[in-house]
A protein has these predicted regions:
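Gly-rich Lys/Arg/Thr-decorated short loops/hinges at beta-loop-alpha junctions or inter-strand turns
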Residues: 105-107, 136, 159-173, 294
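Ferredoxin-type iron-sulfur electron-transfer modules in oxidoreductases and energy-metabolism complexes
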Residues: 347-361, 373, 377-441
């Protein structure tokens, strides 16, 4: 069975919402849309207080090379433009819009009819992705159009589509593939045209039998797209691991996938590409799994960007004794520090964890068992890196590859002594990165 070669773990899957169809979340009374909800430089606000905007209208422009346009997810009046705390607690510029109906920009095709023929040229597709503010929906939120600005000396041999969804609990991709498989295929065809790659490989874990069967059937009409079942193993969906599993190519340290002739996108991104290329619809909504062991009805909602997280949780119901709410999955997600914040691109899951699940085991001394080393998918030695970080020996951290850590959490998950290994390594990466930055000034 196809998989990456080193390490990996298999946490409890807990895909409680996999059978819950995607529903439209009620339109909120107001939205707060952050201008910096992507990797790179925040977009520059192009509206002012008092302006009336329509759904799909650009309200902030990504003017830097690595940036993305931001659009209104609703129609209404701009009432405030000011710093607003996001779920991490950090303040970012937010545009508050009082909702007045649901009027869409006239240039957007809002019909449910599937548009199959791709009429845009390669460059027009890339330009459309930029115009519509499409970013990677797998979590990183890297502006998609930048990936397809391929240097003239590079060639793309493979377009890889990450449909692994290896994080526990999250089922957004699962539902997208069941309910919007053809739109995803058309989006992938558009990306093939933009990249010049001869083939696209969809990597999907073999625990999704129903999805694999459905995708394989739909893919029969798309000869350049292959569905590739993979072994169920975390972090199968990590970029470098996916590349190794599907192509047997290795991305060198500090390099990007294009160096080995590969571009990687998420299946959710493929759906956003379809909307942009075929419907001229910007990225203004996200499909979010709302789940947890104590959640009465785990669900998948299509939610307008900028919707209040508090409103979403109140609508679903916060279980008693909830100790932590995470954006993303339990392995790589981030805890919400501020519940009075608003959704943004790439927030694929709201996970409510019971107090009993949040308690860490008592930390004891390292027993030198080496399990953290055996599960590291990057071939690092967490057993060495943690004490180096504790001793603030960041030069040695760098020499031992700390910057190659993807922060997947496998080492900490596997540690029988309950040591906060990945927490220390994350800190060490931050300090080491600052040292490297200062050195290169």
């Amino acid at each position: 069975m196809i998989t990456f070669k080193k390490g990996g773990v298999h946490p409890e899957e807990n895909k409680f919402a996999k059978n819950a169809k995607i529903e439209e979340f009620p339109l909120p009374d107001l939205v707060v849309i952050y201008t910096g909800q992507h990797l790179g430089v925040p977009a520059v606000t192009k509206v002012k207080v008092g302006d009336y905007v329509k759904a799909g209208q650009m309200i902030a422009e990504g003017e830097a090379f690595i940036s993305a346009n931001v659009h209104s997810s609703v129609s209404g009046t701009v009432t405030k433009i000011e710093p607003v705390a996001d779920f991490s607690g950090y303040k970012k510029e937010g545009i508050t819009i009082q909702v007045e109906g649901d009027v869409w920009d006239e240039s957007i095709d809002c019909s449910p009819e599937i548009k199959r023929e791709i009429t845009l040229s390669k460059q027009e597709i890339i330009d459309r992705l930029k115009t519509c503010g499409v970013v990677g929906m797998g979590g990183a939120c890297f502006p998609t159009h930048v990936k397809y600005m391929i240097p003239p000396d590079k060639q793309v041999d493979y377009l890889l589509i990450n449909a692994a969804e290896c994080e526990p609990y999250i089922t957004t991709d699962h539902r997208i593939m069941l309910e919007h498989a053809e739109e995803c295929m058309i989006g992938i065809e558009a990306l093939l045209k933009a990249s010049g790659a001869p083939v696209a490989l969809i990597g999907i874990e073999n625990n999704k039998k129903e999805v694999i069967a459905h995708l394989t059937q739909v893919a029969q009409h798309y000869p350049n797209i292959k569905v590739c079942p993979m072994k169920t193993k975390y972090p199968q969906g990590a970029e470098k691991q996916l590349i190794q599993a599907l192509t047997n190519r290795r991305v060198p340290s500090g390099k990007l996938p294009i160096e080995v002739g590969v571009i990687v996108n998420n299946i959710n991104t493929a759906l956003a590409v379809y909307d942009a290329v075929q419907k001229n619809k910007p990225l203004v909504e996200d499909i979010v799994t709302i789940t947890g062991k104590k959640v009465k009805q785990p669900c998948n909602y299509k939610i307008r960007l900028g919707t209040s997280i508090q409103q979403i949780l109140d609508h679903v119901g916060i279980p008693e004794n909830t100790g932590k709410i995470i954006v993303g999955g339990p392995m790589m997600g981030k805890p919400i520090a501020n519940i009075n914040s608003y959704t943004k691109k790439g927030a694929s899951c709201l996970l409510m964890m019971d107090e009993s699940e949040c308690k860490r085991g008592e930390v004891s001394p390292c027993i030198r068992c080496g399990r953290c080393v055996s599960v590291c998918p990057m071939g690092l030695e967490p057993i060495l890196l943690q004490p180096l970080v504790e001793a603030q020996r960041y030069d040695e951290c760098e020499r031992n590859g700390i910057m190659n850590c993807m922060e997947c959490g496998s080492c900490q998950f596997e540690c029988p002594a309950n040591r906060p290994i990945s927490d220390y390594i994350r800190l060490g990466k931050s300090r080491t990165a600052q040292i490297i930055k200062n050195r290169n000034k």
